[in-house]
Amino acid sequence: MLEFAPICIYLVISLLVSLILLGVPFLFASNSSTYPEKLSAYECGFDPFGDARSRFDIRFYLVSILFIIFDLEVTFFFPWAVSLNKIDLFGFWSMMAFLLILTIGFLYEWKRGALDWE
């Protein structure tokens, strides 16, 4: 248990700092009435043309999530490519299995029409 002490201390300190940083604004925030202009979106000195908090199409979120997933795939491939001459066949085939799983997922999303913009 002693070998985990630095990790536990780090987690406790991180939690305390996070809670302090979240709580300090509540101590110093003023309770004065706010003006509606302060709550509206600022558009370079002009009156806002419309509501800045409009809804986005769900396809934007889907495309962004797919981008993050495949961007992480590339992030995993860089260290693998650098150490390719040092790993054995198990490392090679495990990364090929990882690539196959992600390719199957990509083909599934493509077949379901997640990438079609209608």
Curated annotation (Swiss-Prot):
Catalytic activity field: a ubiquinone + NADH + 5 H(+)(in) = a ubiquinol + NAD(+) + 4 H(+)(out)
Bilayer disposition of the protein: Multi-pass membrane protein
One Pfam family from the record: Oxidored_q4
Cellular compartments annotated: Mitochondrion membrane
GO molecular function: NADH dehydrogenase (ubiquinone) activity
Annotated keywords: Electron transport, Membrane, Mitochondrion, NAD, Respiratory chain, Translocase, Transmembrane, Transmembrane helix, Transport, Ubiquinone
GO CC annotation: mitochondrial membrane
Keyword Electron transport attached: yes
Keyword match Transmembrane: yes
Membrane spanning stretches: 9-29, 62-82, 87-107
Enzyme Commission number(s) of this protein: 7.1.1.2
Role this protein plays: Core subunit of the mitochondrial membrane respiratory chain NADH dehydrogenase (Complex I) that is believed to belong to the minimal assembly required for catalysis. Complex I functions in the transfer of electrons from NADH to the respiratory chain. The immediate electron acceptor for the enzyme is believed to be ubiquinone.
Similarity comment text for this entry: Belongs to the complex I subunit 3 family.
Protein name, UniProt field: NADH-ubiquinone oxidoreductase chain 3
Naturally occurring in which organism (per UniProt): Triticum aestivum (Wheat)
